[in-house]
């Protein structure tokens, strides 16, 4: 199987062979050793299965790919409102440390920055959509200078395509190959 092949590629001694065998809806609490871990379903946002793990006694939350700190997030699934709500939920938790899926550990300031980015691109994309601008043009037109220190600005192509899909009320995303092509073209233009 693909699973067994991947074990061989990375070294099976480094992999846990037990697959997940419990599902939940919305939220659940688990005991891991002496730790209480609260799991919250916050997707679909980045992907369909977004979950955050909150360890209240340690005042830490593990966000998975809900947070890309110092990098442009990528909105594969959406809707963006779920992602913004996930940020609000994280901010409402009693946490000192936020462990993102990508980049350095942060605090609530990092979460607010991602929330502000998502709100900004939503509003900017909506204005352009309402004015009849095509998604590909909007990607190039939206001013990202406030986020110029963040990596991977080409992800705006996927984000705007996802937002336009959301505005049209469609579920099916663009072909992934097309989205990667658009990101590549944005990289080439910045060259």
Across the structure, where does each feature detected by a protein language model lie?
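Single conserved hydrophobic/aromatic residue that forms the stacking wall/gate
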Residues: 1-16
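Glycine-rich, flexible loop/turn motifs
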Residues: 5, 20, 26, 68-71, ...
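Residues that recognize and position ribonucleotide moieties
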Residues: 7, 22, 60
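Solvent-exposed polar/charged
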Residues: 7-8, 92, 140
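Active-site HxH/HxHxD metal-binding segment of metal-dependent hydrolases
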Residues: 12-13, 17-32, 48, 123
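Metallo-beta-lactamase
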Residues: 29, 36, 41-127
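C-terminal regulatory/interaction regions
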Residues: 133-191
């Amino acid at each position: 199987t693909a699973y067994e092949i991947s074990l061989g590629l990375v070294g099976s001694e480094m992999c846990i062979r037990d697959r997940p065998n419990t599902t939940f809806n919305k939220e659940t609490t688990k005991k891991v050793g002496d730790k209480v871990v609260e799991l919250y379903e916050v997707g679909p946002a980045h992907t369909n299965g977004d979950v955050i793990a909150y360890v209240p006694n340690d005042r830490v939350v593990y966000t998975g790919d809900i947070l890309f700190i110092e990098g442009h997030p990528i909105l594969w699934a959406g809707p963006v409102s779920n992602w913004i709500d996930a940020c609000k939920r994280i901010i409402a938790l009693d946490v000192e440390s936020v462990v993102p899926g990508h980049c350095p550990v942060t605090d609530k300031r990092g979460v607010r920055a991602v929330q502000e980015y998502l709100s900004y691109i939503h509003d900017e994309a909506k204005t352009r959509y309402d004015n009849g601008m095509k998604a590909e043009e909007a990607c190039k037109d939206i001013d990202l200078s406030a986020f110029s220190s963040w990596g991977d600005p080409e992800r705006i192509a996927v984000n705007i395509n996802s937002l336009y899909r959301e505005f049209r009320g469609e579920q099916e995303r663009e072909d992934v190959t097309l989205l990667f092509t658009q990101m590549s073209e944005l990289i080439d233009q910045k060259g």
